Amino acid sequence: MAVPPTYADLGKSARDVFTKGYGFGLIKLDLKTKSENGLEFTSSGSANTETTKVNGSLETKYRWTEYGLTFTEKWNTDNTLGTEITVEDQLARGLKLTFDSSFSPNTGKKNAKIKTGYKREHINLGCDVDFDIAGPSIRGALVLGYEGWLAGYQMNFETSKSRVTQSNFAVGYKTDEFQLHTNVNDGTEFGGSIYQKVNKKLETAVNLAWTAGNSNTRFGIAAKYQVDPDACFSAKVNNSSLIGLGYTQTLKPGIKLTLSALLDGKNVNAGGHKLGLGLEFQA
């Protein structure tokens, strides 16, 4: 097996089938450009059709490939400024170091994180330190992989409380066409997902989750069908009879349109359904 994914990316293929291609209740516009010197600009804006709240963000990224460095600057409409510096494969092959900081001029709130990651065949390690006024917190994760089998552990230790505040386990199996993922969070949250690539055009996923002491099980199925190279259709439904539909069309190279709708299957004629519209420009 190649390098296993990070803990956060375990079960990602199934999650993508459930989440990508939808934007319920939002009108969204994304713009991505790249200059000749390698400077990348990404801007995003969205308006919530229910609350009419408008959010926006701007990100600039520059990669200094020769030294394995990436510089990122971020800003959003909450007036939060962020800076991220990443160095990869320089101190050691497979080692990635990131310094992430943010500052809100309105509130004076500051935040800083140091993220480390190390990956090689059969293993993926991660350790993040979040510097907070109350005291630093340490998040560590480990994923092991062998012949398609994956096992991972994630924990969060808060120095202010001197104890582990989060402890998560995951086990799974992965091939190019099939993925199985199960997880237990803090011994109370249980979940599982199955991803199946039926053929070149059709992808399906099943998701299951429940909480200890609660008989309510959450269940959902989803599918994505690539109609042609420029269009795809997505659909999903859960045990609450919420039906999600999405359609993505590439209008021309660099311009993509996404339409989505969330329907209440129990009250189809009652209204209250959510619609979404997204436009993405890339140059």
UniProtKB/Swiss-Prot annotation:
Keyword set for this entry? Answer: Acetylation, Apoptosis, ATP-binding, Cell membrane, Ion transport, Isopeptide bond, Lipid transport, Lipid-binding, Membrane, Mitochondrion, Mitochondrion outer membrane, NAD, Nucleotide-binding, Phosphoprotein, Porin, Transmembrane, Transmembrane beta strand, Transport, Ubl conjugation
Annotated binding of ATP, by residue: 12, 20
Chief site of localization: mitochondrion
Which parts of the sequence carry Phosphoserine? 13, 137, 193, 240
Q: Which domain of life is it from?
A: Eukaryota
Quote the subcellular location field of this record.
Mitochondrion outer membrane; Cell membrane; Membrane raft
PTM per Swiss-Prot/TrEMBL: Phosphorylation at Ser-193 by NEK1 promotes the closed conformational state preventing excessive mitochondrial membrane permeability and subsequent apoptotic cell death after injury. Phosphorylation by the AKT-GSK3B axis stabilizes the protein probably by preventing ubiquitin-mediated proteasomal degradation.
- Write down which residues bear the modification named N-acetylalanine: 2
Summarizing activity control, the record says: Inhibited by nitric oxide. Voltage-gated ion channel activity is inhibited by lanthanum(3+) and ruthenium red. Mitochondrial calcium transport is inhibited by lanthanum(3+), ruthenium red and Ru360.
Cellular compartments per GO CC: membrane; membrane raft; mitochondrial membrane; mitochondrial nucleoid; mitochondrial outer membrane; mitochondrial permeability transition pore complex; mitochondrion; plasma membrane
What GO biological process term is on the record, naming one?
epithelial cell differentiation
Q: Which Pfam families match?
A: Porin_3
Note the topology in the membrane: Multi-pass membrane protein
> Which residues are recorded as modified (N6-succinyllysine)?
20
Purpose of the protein: Non-selective voltage-gated ion channel that mediates the transport of anions and cations through the mitochondrion outer membrane and plasma membrane. The channel at the outer mitochondrial membrane allows diffusion of small hydrophilic molecules; in the plasma membrane it is involved in cell volume regulation and apoptosis. It adopts an open conformation at low or zero membrane potential and a closed conformation at potentials above 30-40 mV. The open state has a weak anion selectivity whereas the closed state is cation-selective.
Report quaternary structure and partners: Homodimer and homotrimer; in response to cyclic AMP or calcium; oligomerization is required for scramblase activity. Component of the mitochondrial permeability transition pore complex (mPTPC), at least composed of SPG7, VDAC1 and PPIF. Interacts with SPG7, NIPSNAP2 and SLC25A30. Interacts with hexokinases including HK1. The HK1-VDAC1 complex interacts with ATF2. Interacts with BCL2L1. Interacts with BAK1. Interacts with RTL10/BOP (via BH3 domain). Interacts with amyloid-beta and APP; induces VDAC1 dephosphorylation. Interacts with TMEM41B. Interacts with BCAP31.
For this chain, the family text in UniProt reads: Belongs to the eukaryotic mitochondrial porin family.
Print the domain comment field: Consists mainly of a membrane-spanning beta-barrel formed by 19 beta-strands. The helical N-terminus folds back into the pore opening and plays a role in voltage-gated channel activity.
Its protein name is: Non-selective voltage-gated ion channel VDAC1
Q: Provide the organism lineage as a comma list.
A: Eukaryota, Metazoa, Chordata, Craniata, Vertebrata
